[in-house]
């Protein structure tokens, strides 16, 4: 299924039903009073989060949504039926922006959570309500109000505990495959991962969600490659893993590669740059010898001061220990 994380849709809530003008007409009641009922309220449109939905693709092909109108009132003080509300099902983590103001107006962050997008029009009033001591046969009524109209942009930001960051072919997809049941495509060419993938990592009785996004390249913060579009999915992660290929096939310098990604991250968002971040040195199985020494030299060259982890995602070496350490960190954050 194609991953869609941003769409623009038009919403029209239902119109309220008109009030009714009616008079009681029964045998032996020659002067029956007014009995016109009220109309029904128009239907509203809501956003509803569903943890089983992963993309906004359904809204890419259908762009206009209408809630049901309220029915008009009837005689004998019968109220019109209210229009049915319409629920648009979206992934957890979907935000809503008003197109006219470009301001965020709401979001749904938990399974089953709802958010009203547009309100249905109020019902019209029947002539029963206008009877008075001076007007026993009123012909006055009110029309139902128009429903609210709005054009909105839906944006999906994935909800993950841990996000993977790195250059294309750093081994992020292999890592998420090795510690979870996620199955992103893996191959020896750039941008094998075209869309974000989520995987649930289980550690004993605990579990956390890991997200793999397409690799970041130089200029990603300005829109180069796939980086800008998907960097936003890191914003809600509780921590970030910067995955570095210690032995790239391209024979590029791992030190330069590390700083290239860090630079793009800082340019994109200072808030994202300030998130807890851990260094993961991957593909240590490709080092001929002195693995520990070479990794230590790399860490010293980049001036990294925090905890770092050496792994071979392809051989599943060090990945279990990495998962345990991440789980310990996340448990302390709760």
Curated annotation (Swiss-Prot):
PROSITE patterns, alphabetized: G_OBG, GTP1_OBG, OBG
Keywords noted in UniProt: Cytoplasm, GTP-binding, Hydrolase, Magnesium, Metal-binding, Nucleotide-binding
Cofactor(s) listed in the protein's UniProt record: Mg(2+)
Matching Gene3D superfamilies: GTP1/OBG domain, P-loop containing nucleotide triphosphate hydrolases
Localization, UniProt: Cytoplasm
Domain OBG-type G: 160-331
KW Membrane (keyword) present: no
Main localisation: cytoplasm
Residue pairs linked by disulfide bridges in the UniProt entry: none
Keyword Magnesium carried by entry: yes
Amino-acid positions noted as binding Mg(2+) in the UniProt annotation, renumbered to this chain: 173, 193
Pfam families: GTP1_OBG, MMR_HSR1
GO terms (BP aspect): ribosome biogenesis
GO molecular function, a single term: magnesium ion binding
Residues in Obg domain copies: 1-159
Residues annotated as binding GTP: 166-173, 191-195, 212-215, 282-285, 312-314
Organism domain of life: Bacteria
PANTHER family for this protein: DEVELOPMENTALLY REGULATED GTP-BINDING PROTEIN-RELATED, MITOCHONDRIAL RIBOSOME-ASSOCIATED GTPASE 2
Family of this protein: Belongs to the TRAFAC class OBG-HflX-like GTPase superfamily. OBG GTPase family.
Subunit structure: Monomer.
Name of protein: GTPase Obg
Species, as recorded: Francisella tularensis subsp. mediasiatica (strain FSC147)
Gene for this chain: obg
